[in-house]
Design a protein with these regions (language model features):
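N-terminal Rossmann-like FAD-binding beta1-loop-alpha1 element of flavoenzymes
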Residues: 2-29
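Conserved Rossmann-like nucleotide-cofactor binding loop
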Residues: 12, 35, 209
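Flavin-dependent oxidoreductases
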Residues: 15, 175-180, 184-285, 294, ...
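Glycine-rich FAD pyrophosphate-binding loop
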Residues: 22-42
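Dinucleotide-binding Rossmann-like beta1-alpha1 core, especially the glycine-rich loop
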Residues: 46-126, 256-257
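Short beta-strand to alpha-helix junction loop
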Residues: 55, 62-65, 90-99, 138-157, ...
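Helical element adjacent to the flavin cofactor pocket in flavoenzyme catalytic cores
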Residues: 138-200
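C-terminal catalytic lobe of FAD-dependent flavoproteins
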Residues: 254, 263-264, 280-369
């Protein structure tokens, strides 16, 4: 029997596994895909957010700011490509700049350092390719960019090196509560071979499918909507078109279309935000890609879209409550959710790992190695 079984080997599950590998515990990670980082974690904006957008007091706010703070040491210790290039949220002449004032106020309440609102003249010194309609912007120097593949792989490899077992191509089909433990029935996705796992604690880090596992064991039902985001990746020749991550004023659907350099020297434009019923729908659409070019031009002019080298789409796990769901299910002792992890999930991942591992350690009275 395992002390802890983690469902999902994305950046969240892998971060939790790494933190748990510091304890005297028998831990496994169960992943239905053929490798780690094969779901939401592989198709996102690759941004380490500063933390000014989340509602003060929310888990998103607390964990975003903490995760951001952890990135310098993590990137050094685990050799994760990471750069603090800073971010700008720009306001155009058709928008009310009070939206920037609100972001500034939220950011200051969340403890984000160095925030300030800049006028157009100063913005153009930083980013000459801003659109002619941009009037002002919020500057966040602690914003950064990262490689989500390297980040997830680094967490997983470090966890594995320190004793965590990984079971890939293994799909969880059912979870049953027992006295003091859980039984997980799984099937190998290549061979259809069934396998049973038993664990004292289950950690649900299953992305867009996290509600399904919660609802197997708890009467407190979750509902997660898959929100599809499409992206265009441009050639490295376009990589210097902007140097900061350029955001638009956020809406209820997200942070708008961003234009950002990547840590590998490309330029990334995206995402769209469309709710879908199919939780496997990672296809791109012509309408979606066309809208990216049009919407990106509102904040950055002359984006060289003819230099697009690939496009892709990913799914965000949006929960109806608009916050991360982290903690033990009230009516399922030993079942810990890390669910509804949408933006700023990548930024928050190190802190989520820290928090969830701490919850599991307290439940099991684990001691550090």
């Amino acid at each position: 029997m395992y002390d802890v079984a983690i469902i999902g080997a994305g950046v969240i599950g892998s971060a939790i596994a790494r933190e748990l590998s510091r304890y005297q515990a028998n831990v496994c990670v169960i992943e239905r895909e053929e490798d780690v980082c094969d779901g939401t974690s592989k198709a996102n904006s690759a941004i380490i957010h500063a933390g000014f957008d989340a509602a003060p007091g929310s888990l998103k706010a607390k964990l975003n700011v903490r995760g951001n703070e952890m990135m310098d040491a993590l990137s050094k210790d685990l050799d994760i490509p990471f750069k603090r290039n800073g971010s700008l949220v720009v306001c155009t002449k058709d928008q009310d700049r009070s939206g920037l004032d609100a972001l500034l106020e939220k950011g200051e309440k969340n403890g984000v350092p160095g925030l300030r609102i800049l006028e157009r003249e100063e913005l153009l010194q930083m980013e000459p390719n801003l659109s002619d309609d941009v009037t002002c912007g919020l500057y966040a120097p602690t914003g950064g960019i990262v490689c989500p593949f390297h980040m997830t792989m680094a967490f997983a490899e470090n966890a594995y090196t320190n004793g965590v077992s990984f079971f890939l191509n293994t799909k969880v089909t059912s979870i049953r509560k027992k006295d003091g433990s859980y039984t997980l029935e799984t099937i190998h996705t290549d061979t259809d071979t069934p396998e049973t796992f038993e664990a004292k604690v289950i950690i649900n880090a299953a992305g867009v499918h996290a509600d399904e596992f919660n609802n197997m064991v708890s009467e407190h039902k979750l509902h997660i909507t898959a929100r599809k985001g499409e992206y265009c990746l441009l050639d490295k020749e376009a990589g210097t078109h902007v140097s900061h991550t350029i955001f638009q004023l956020p809406s209820k659907m997200g942070k708008g279309v961003l234009v950002t350099p990547t840590v590998h020297g490309n330029l990334l434009v995206g995402p769209t935000a469309v709710d879908v019923t199919n939780k496997e729908a990672v296809n791109t659409t012509q309408d979606g890609l066309d809208s990216l070019a049009k919407t990106a031009a509102l904040s950055v002019k002359n984006v060289p879209m003819r230099q697009v080298i690939t496009s892709f789409a990913g799914l965000r796990a949006h929960e109806d409550g608009n916050d991360f769901i982290i903690g033990e299910a009230e009516d399922a002792k030993g079942f810990i959710n890390a669910a509804g992890i949408e933006s700023p999930g990548l930024s928050s991942a190190p802190a989520i790992g820290e928090m969830v591992a701490g919850i599991a350690a307290d439940l099991l009275f684990l001691t550090k190695k």
